[in-house]
């Protein structure tokens, strides 16, 4: 979902939409359901969206985009012009970024030119926030996941040399003499961030053609590469599919990958006049803001609090959180249980229990930290972690850790709620101050995290008089399937 300000060419907005749809209709193999139209939703702050012109039953095909139309490394002529296996050399993220930079610089000569014109050119994703704006997120760990400096290093190390070597394929924009100048570096970083943000917000993992009927999943990584990312599937920009706005509650469509095409289908009946929504999945508003540049209340149920290993160890009285100098951490690490952080979700059930929300790995860590020396020796000799039981001692450590986490935020939940109540709604259209919009989104994110924190603290107080027992979840064997992964 994009705000009005993300599409600066207000006068050409509808013409760009019309040209895009004409381009799709004229493209071989594209099938568009006549019941759909690409709508101007700027009046409600949603940019473009796809709307049903008449009733659509569940299971009906909405549109089909041939694989050859998807903007991928495989489909771009750049791969042939460079004569290199870009995905193998650069990984799926940077190779697609390079291809998109190439196609973007081709302008009208690019086969995807009408597609580029309907994509946003401005973003509210955290990659584009100023340091002062990021401070509004306070102690949210989402700030640590932005990775701006790493992204820029990747652009300079992997993409800049190719542009400098082949100016015939990557002509500098008007007014720019060379990519190798300071101005050229700044221009490349800017266009790289734009393309990287488009990939992060809109690209899909593209399965091999023979893997029929797999659902397309919008990727959720930042656009830096590491060893794991290079093993991921190729990325692709799917025209029209990525123009669907997302809504956790009103999701009514899903992308399916078939042998020759990517097909969007209705997963429930869609009434005339209703917007067609994709879904990003169960992601917290902090990640919604990082990846897509907006927040909505209906994703608040997925808000989480992240508790770092460092904070837990400090609450337990350890000098540091280094497994090499902390035998108990080293022991858990050897069992593949230790994490660098633990995600605590928002309790959403009518009668939530600690067992439902506390990660088993976190409880095992707390139980290990409270073992007596003799008990710890026995565990080491058996090469078996303690059962995930949250007794009074473990609860006390967790409460201290949460209180320390609470103190990391610059303001209290009460003051944030009071501030939110005092703010008047921003207009959906017109000139909306960018900074004011971002401050409000940051406020929503930190309120969600503080609500989770306060709720869990309230649940822990009665637990200090007893203990929480839970199933061992196979901790004597392979625990990797239940590990809490940080994204």
In which residue ranges do the predicted regions lie?
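Eukaryotic helix-linker segments that join adjacent hydrophobic helices
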Residues: 69-71, 76-129
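Long, positively charged leader/targeting segments at protein N-termini
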Residues: 2-69, 74-77, 117-487
């Amino acid at each position: 979902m994009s705000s009005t300000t993300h599409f600066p060419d207000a006068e050409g907005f509808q013409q760009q939409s019309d040209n895009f749809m004409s381009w799709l209709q004229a493209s071989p193999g594209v099938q568009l359901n006549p019941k759909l139209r690409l709508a101007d939703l700027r009046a409600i702050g949603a940019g473009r969206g796809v709307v049903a012109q008449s009733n659509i039953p569940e299971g009906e095909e909405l549109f089909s985009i041939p694989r050859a139309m998807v903007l991928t490394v495989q489909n771009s002529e750049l791969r042939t012009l460079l004569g290199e296996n870009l995905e193998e050399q650069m990984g799926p993220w940077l190779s697609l970024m390079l291809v998109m930079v190439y196609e973007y610089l081709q302008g009208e000569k690019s086969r995807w030119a009408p597609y580029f014109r309907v994509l946003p050119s401005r973003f509210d994703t955290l990659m584009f926030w100023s340091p002062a704006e990021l401070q509004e997120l306070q102690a949210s760990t989402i700030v640590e996941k932005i990775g701006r400096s790493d992204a820029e290093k990747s652009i300079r190390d992997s993409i800049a040399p190719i542009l400098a070597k082949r100016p015939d394929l990557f002509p500098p924009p008007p007014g720019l003499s060379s990519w190798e100048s300071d101005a050229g570096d700044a221009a490349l970083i800017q266009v790289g961030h734009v393309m990287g943000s488009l990939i992060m917000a809109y690209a899909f993992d593209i399965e091999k053609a023979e893997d029929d009927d797999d659902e397309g999943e919008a990727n959720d990584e930042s656009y830096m590469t590491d060893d794991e990312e290079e093993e991921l599937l190729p990325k692709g920009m799917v025209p029209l599919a990525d123009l669907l706005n997302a809504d956790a509650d009103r999701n009514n469509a899903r992308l399916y990958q078939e042998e020759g095409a990517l097909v969007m289908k209705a997963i429930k009946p869609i009434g005339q006049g209703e917007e067609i929504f994709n879904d990003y999945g169960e992601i917290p508003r902090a990640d919604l803001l990082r990846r897509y540049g907006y927040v909505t209340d209906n994703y608040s149920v997925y808000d989480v609090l992240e508790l770092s290993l460092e904070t837990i160890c400090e609450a337990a009285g350890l000098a540091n959180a280094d497994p090499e100098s902390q035998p108990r951490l080293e022991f858990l690490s050897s069992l593949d249980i230790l994490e660098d952080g633990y995600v605590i979700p928002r309790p959403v059930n009518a009668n939530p229990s600690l067992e439902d929300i506390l990660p088993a790995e976190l409880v095992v860590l707390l139980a290990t930290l409270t073992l007596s020396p003799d008990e710890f020796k026995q565990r080491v000799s058996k090469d078996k972690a303690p059962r995930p039981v949250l007794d009074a001692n473990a609860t006390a450590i967790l409460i201290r850790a949460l209180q320390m986490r609470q103190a990391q935020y610059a303001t209290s939940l009460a003051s944030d709620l009071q501030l939110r109540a005092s703010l008047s709604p921003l207009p959906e259209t017109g000139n909306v101050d960018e900074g004011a919009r971002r401050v409000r989104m940051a406020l929503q994110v930190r309120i969600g995290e503080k609500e989770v924190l306060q709720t869990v603290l309230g649940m822990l107080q009665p637990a200090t008089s007893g203990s929480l027992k839970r199933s061992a979840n196979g901790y004597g064997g392979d625990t990797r399937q239940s590990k809490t992964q940080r994204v």
